[in-house]
């Protein structure tokens, strides 16, 4: 059984027991979280596709950890003008473990 849900402006395909890295959620580590923006649920041959969301579709998960991703370097440069700028960015994330899928 697997499902596709929406979180943080992105879509994720998950199955039970899987750990997924999402955009930062303001929920403490170890707490349960429930996602109700389920786009699709598949159980063997039976597939439910939402318009846009599946009625009664829920994904239960547990927050495992919070952290920051790898640094991305941003460089602005203009040739012959002695103009260079550098910046860096590290995006916050939340790791969640999927504990249940229902539709």
From Swiss-Prot:
GO biological process, one term: translation
GO CC annotations on file: cytoplasm; ribonucleoprotein complex; ribosome
Keywords: Ribonucleoprotein, Ribosomal protein, RNA-binding, rRNA-binding
Classification via PANTHER family: 50S RIBOSOMAL PROTEIN L21 (PTHR21349), LARGE RIBOSOMAL SUBUNIT PROTEIN BL21M (PTHR21349:SF0)
Function, as annotated: This protein binds to 23S rRNA in the presence of protein L20.
NCBIfam families per the UniProt record, alphabetical: L21 (TIGR00061)
Name the record gives this protein: Large ribosomal subunit protein bL21
Organism: Pectobacterium atrosepticum (strain SCRI 1043 / ATCC BAA-672) (Erwinia carotovora subsp. atroseptica)
